[in-house]
Regions:
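Hydrophobic beta-strand scaffold residues
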Residues: 55, 144, 165, 224-225, ...
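N-terminal ligand-binding/catalytic initiation module
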Residues: 1-86
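Glycine-rich phosphate/diphosphate-binding loop of Rossmann-like nucleotide-binding domains
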Residues: 90-178
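Rossmann-like adenosine-cofactor binding region
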Residues: 118, 151-231
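Adenosine-phosphate binding glycine-rich loop
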Residues: 107, 199-308
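Predominant activation on well-ordered alpha-helical scaffold segments within soluble catalytic domains
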Residues: 4-7, 38-49, 69-72, 96-104, ...
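Flexible, glycine/charged-enriched surface loops at secondary-structure junctions
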Residues: 14-19, 54-60, 111-120, 168, ...
C-alpha cells in the first residue's frame, strides 16, 4: 500500500514538474544499513531490466549513487549516475535546492522576509537530502533543531550548522516556525498533529500526510503546508535531464534543470495563492493542477500517435 502511494505521488510529482513521464516506485525490503550488497543490487537491476525501459530506477532513501551504479552493470534502466557526459549524479542536492527555495517562498509569504533570519526550523532526517538542506537553511540564517536515528551523522551535521539536537520523537514538540520532514512519510498524522506549533510545513519527505484529512486539519488551523511532491521535485528534474540527454545522445544540461526548477517555484506560488483565494487546502489545489497536467499530457501523446 505504501509503495502504491509513493508511485501515485511520483506521477503527480512528474506532472507538477512538467515532465512528460508517468510515475512509479520500487522498494527493496531490508535494512539499508546492514543488508546492502553488490549482489542485492545486481538482482534488483535484473528485476528492473525485465520491464524493458517502462520504468527507470534512481537513488532514494537508503539507496546511494554507488548502489545505482551496481544495478547499472546489468541494466541500462537506471538514472542518477556519476559517469558519462549525460550523467546527472546524486539528485539529492537538487532536491534540497528546491525545498530550500520553497522555504524562502513560504518565508516571504508568512513573514515578509527574503531570508530565514530569526526563524527556527525543526528538521527531521539529515540523510541524503536533509543534510544538504540543513546547510542551506543555516546559511540563510535559520536556527536549526535536528533529529535523526543515525546519531553519528546527526552530530556531524549539527556541528557544522550550529544546530540543536533532540530525540526522534521529540521533534514534533520543538517550538519552531517551520517543520521540515526529510525522512520517511506519514509523519503528519493524528498522533503528531496536536503537538506541532509551527506555522508552516516545508520538507523533502514523500507522502508526508498520513491521510488527506490531515491536510485539511492543517489548513483549518492556519498551518501552511507546502505539498511534498511539488517542492521535492528537484531530484526527478535532475535525473530527467539525464534521461533526456541519453535519448538525444547529448550531455547533461544544468540550464534546462534550472529552468524547470524555476518553473516549479512558480507553480508553488500559484498553489499558495489559489489556496488563499479559493479557500482550499494546498494539497487539494496541487492535486487539481497535477491531474490537469496529466490529462493534457495524455491528450498530447494521443494526438502525436494519431498524427504519426
Amino acid at each position: 500500500e505504501d509503495v502504491l502511494r509513493l508511485s501515485r505521488g511520483m506521477s503527480y510529482k512528474n506532472a507538477i514538474a512538467d515532465l512528460e513521464m508517468g510515475g512509479g516506485k520500487s522498494v527493496i525490503i531490508g535494512d539499508s544499513r546492514t543488508q546492502k550488497t553488490p549482489e542485492l543490487f545486481a538482482a534488483f537491476g535484473r528485476a528492473v531490466d525485465t520491464l524493458g525501459g517502462t520504468y527507470y530506477a534512481a537513488e532514494d532513501v537508503g539507496v546511494s549513487v554507488d548502489d545505482v551504479a551496481e544495478a547499472r552493470k546489468v541494466t541500462p534502466y537506471v538514472l542518477g549516475l556519476n559517469d558519462g557526459p549525460e550523467a546527472s549524479g546524486d539528485p539529492s542536492p537538487v532536491t534540497a535546492e528546491g525545498v530550500y527555495r520553497s522555504t524562502l517562498v513560504v518565508a516571504r509569504r508568512l513573514w515578509n522576509q527574503d531570508d530565514l533570519t530569526g526563524l527556527t526550523v525543526a528538521l527531521q532526517g539529515v540523510g541524503h537530502v536533509g543534510g544538504y538542506l540543513a546547510d542551506k537553511l543555516h546559511a540563510a540564517g535559520a536556527r536549526l533543531v535536528l533529529t535523526d536515528v543515525n546519531e553519528e551523522l546527526l552530530a556531524e551535521v549539527a556541528a557544522r550548522t550550529n544546530a540543536g539536537i533532540v530525540a526522534p520523537d521529540a521533534i514534533y514538540d520543538v517550538k519552531a516556525d517551520i517543520y521540515a520532514p526529510c525522512a520517511l512519510g506519514a509523519t503528519l498524522n493524528a498522533r503528531t498533529l496536536d503537538r506541532l506549533t509551527v506555522r508552516a510545513v516545508v520538507g523533502a519527505a514523500n507522502n508526508q500526510l498520513a491521510t488527506p484529512e490531515i491536510g485539511e486539519a492543517l489548513f483549518a488551523r492556519g498551518v501552511l503546508y507546502a505539498p511534498d511532491y511539488v517542492i521535492n521535485g528537484g531530484g526527478i528534474i535532475n535525473v530527467a535531464s539525464e534521461l533526456r540527454a541519453r535519448k538525444a545522445g547529448g550531455a547533461y544540461d544544468p540550464a534546462w534543470v534550472e529552468t524547470k526548477l524555476a518553473r516549479l517555484m512558480e507553480t508553488l506560488e500559484e498553489i499558495l495563492e489559489r489556496s488563499v483565494t479559493e479557500r482550499l487546502p494546498t494539497h487539494q489545489i496541487a492535486a487539481v493542477i497535477a491531474e490537469a497536467r496529466i490529462e493534457a499530457a495524455v491528450g498530447r501523446r494521443a494526438a502525436r500517435r494519431q498524427a504519426g
